[in-house]
């Protein structure tokens, strides 16, 4: 259920702001969004997996915090990112 190393590298290179950028909010939000999508698919088939559901809620909260931070610092980057990721806002 976790992200493969190849997929993680692809996401980092796609959303990175510089060559070796792995910690920018854009990269972190993209990685969290991928994990959230994987957990959502898992929960569609395993509806009673409450431990995974709690993990999903924690990831969503973490992503929400990073999105709030990015919106507070640079609204243009925030708008571009949610458009690229297809998040509803």
Swiss-Prot record:
GO biological process, one term: translation
The UniProt record lists the keyword Translocase: no
Pfam family, one: Ribosomal_S15
Alphabetized InterPro entries for the sequence: Ribosomal_uS15 (IPR000589), Ribosomal_uS15_bac-type (IPR005290), uS15_NS1_RNA-bd_sf (IPR009068)
Cellular component GO terms held in the UniProt record: cytosolic small ribosomal subunit
Keywords: Ribonucleoprotein, Ribosomal protein, RNA-binding, rRNA-binding
tRNA processing as UniProt keyword: no
One of the record's GO molecular function terms: structural constituent of ribosome
Domain of life, per lineage: Bacteria
NCBIfam families for this protein: S15_bact
General function of this protein: One of the primary rRNA binding proteins, it binds directly to 16S rRNA where it helps nucleate assembly of the platform of the 30S subunit by binding and bridging several RNA helices of the 16S rRNA. Forms an intersubunit bridge (bridge B4) with the 23S rRNA of the 50S subunit in the ribosome.
HAMAP family xrefs: Ribosomal_uS15_B
UniProt similarity note: Belongs to the universal ribosomal protein uS15 family.
Protein name: Small ribosomal subunit protein uS15
Lineage, top ranks: Bacteria, Pseudomonadati, Pseudomonadota, Alphaproteobacteria, Acetobacterales
